[in-house]
């Protein structure tokens, strides 16, 4: 089969012919229907993921159809449409037992210790699998593990959303931001989308209740109302304004961190005196994925796709990811 393989640290990637995977105990083989490109791929190629075992197939977001099942597989069968978590938990530890699989000490990451999904077929451990409800588009399902489900989890850990709560999303036109708007609205929020582009603002207005254009957005946000939740999909460049935007008792779900070398000098006074909470994210759990798939199936979250590329044209996909004019997510169809 064809696959995108990373041969070693900082050695880029290659399109190669590799043997078809075979299922072991507690594993299935899927036909990859869609995968997705991510900024994380670029960070992996730059050497920021020390757990990678080489050579390894790149890609950590997937939806596919089961073609083979190994021994001990229960609850899944050939023909099932599934997604995978970003990692394979052991399924037995205390964290797995309470539904926080992302905290599993023995988890293995796809596109890290395990082969990923930029391939015609993929091998997935049963502990990673989540069934996709009938009628859910592939383009929406593939976004759940690392985009919509991750956002949902961050909001859940930040205490959820009250009906009518005012939420601000930075990087609102990006692959994460445009979907963060939709997740927040699906949960009952009013949403402010922030962008630096007048052209992108026209598109964001189709999803957000309010749009602010510019890098200094906190004062404009305050004129709209009391922002009590920020979903920051950018990182260091927007974090200070995100803090300033929040009213007393507010929360930030911090998702963006495009450049790990950037350091932010945190002003503790903002956190203490405004009684703020900062929430990170470790990717979706099975329950988060199931809940988000349901919202997607119901049409409350609609995938916004900037483009779809083949394995042979994956270079074009990465050019699209780096293009600041794109809106939405870039997918791979093997």
Swiss-Prot record:
Gene3D superfamilies: Medium-chain alcohol dehydrogenases, catalytic domain (3.90.180.10). It catalyses: propanoyl-CoA + NADP(+) = acryloyl-CoA + NADPH + H(+). It is an enzyme of class 1 (oxidoreductase). Its EC number is 1.3.1.84. NADP(+) binds at residues 39, 173-176, 195-197. Zn(2+) 2 binds at residues 90, 93, 96, 104. InterPro entries: Acryloyl-CoA_Reductase_Zn-ADH, ADH-like_C, ADH-like_N, ADH_Zn_CS, GroES-like_sf, NAD(P)-bd_dom_sf, PKS_ER, Quin_OxRdtase/zeta-crystal_CS. Optimum pH is 6.0 at 65 degrees Celsius. Retains half maximum activity at pH 7.5 at 65 degrees Celsius. Zn(2+) 1 binds at residues 38, 60, 146. Keywords: Metal-binding, NADP, Oxidoreductase, Zinc. It holds the Pfam family ADH_zinc_N. Belongs to the zinc-containing alcohol dehydrogenase family. PANTHER family: ALCOHOL DEHYDROGENASE (ZN CONTAINING) (ADH-8) (PTHR43350:SF14), NAD-DEPENDENT ALCOHOL DEHYDROGENASE (PTHR43350). Plays a role in autotrophic carbon fixation via the 3-hydroxypropionate/4-hydroxybutyrate cycle. Catalyzes the acryloyl-CoA dependent NADPH oxidation and formation of propionyl-CoA. Inactive towards 3-hydroxypropionyl-CoA, NADH and crotonyl-CoA. Monomer. This is Acryloyl-coenzyme A reductase. It comes from Sulfurisphaera tokodaii (strain DSM 16993 / JCM 10545 / NBRC 100140 / 7).
